């Protein structure tokens, strides 16, 4: 019998803006952030089985109770679906603020729904929010302004974002998100996300670029000074803007000319940086619209057409 194996991509994200509004009663921080999915991805192979069991293997060390495992297991438990054997080939660097583990969980959840089709949209997004703050956004990608812990989404049309590309650079060490937020104290850096959203609506590229910022950057740079050094260098390499993604330690520079971005990347490669690459934004995809994912049995889906 032919095995039912499908290949999916787990796309990374960048936080183009990130503001901390305060600490909530549940211990989480209230955030507002503009996120953009990019064509940096982990490769995931999923074998769907009739057994009520889930297994996950990877070419990197998986944490106990990984988001990918929890995504498949919770879907199976809540819907009565079959199980899955999951294998992950990692490309997204860990502890980088690029959403790696959440991207894997979102891709697995997306694949489970595509294969079994047993959850309606509200239930699927409720499960995604339970799995992690970035998982709801990474379910369908594209660009969005995200509020709360990141689970309340307002999709953003491509507009001026479609013509940009990103040089992503990560130093060797990573930063623990929990450690960073545990040490976060008010007053927080000034909010830029709402102004950036208005700039996008007005197609005001200059104003939008001036809004790229991250309230977590100062405390992250205190924990890991190489973040500050990388950002200083990125801002001197001809980029339109630069910032840190999520809780770090990955930083990015914005370009509207890919050749310039590639030329800037060469300098970081020569310096022996841990991770460096140039990536494009990707458009979103609708899990519930079969025309939006080009399904190819055995070879996966064309998820998120690269702009």
Give the residues covered by each predicted segment.
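Glycine/threonine-rich beta-strand-loop-alpha-helix active-site module
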Residues: 117-157
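Glycine-rich beta-strand-to-loop/alpha-helix junction loops that act as flexible
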Residues: 100-101, 244-249
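Short, basic/glycine-rich phosphate-binding loops at helix/coil junctions
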Residues: 50-62, 108, 129, 204-213
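ATP-binding N-lobe of GHMP and related small-molecule kinases
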Residues: 1-96, 114-122, 158-161, 170-173
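Conserved, helical-rich catalytic subdomain that frames metal- and/or nucleotide-binding sites
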Residues: 54, 140, 146-241, 256-262, ...
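Phosphate-handling active-site elements
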Residues: 76-87, 111-131, 257-270
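Short hydrophobic/aromatic beta-strand micro-patches
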Residues: 252-254
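DPxDG-like acidic metal-binding loop motif
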Residues: 96-122, 137-139
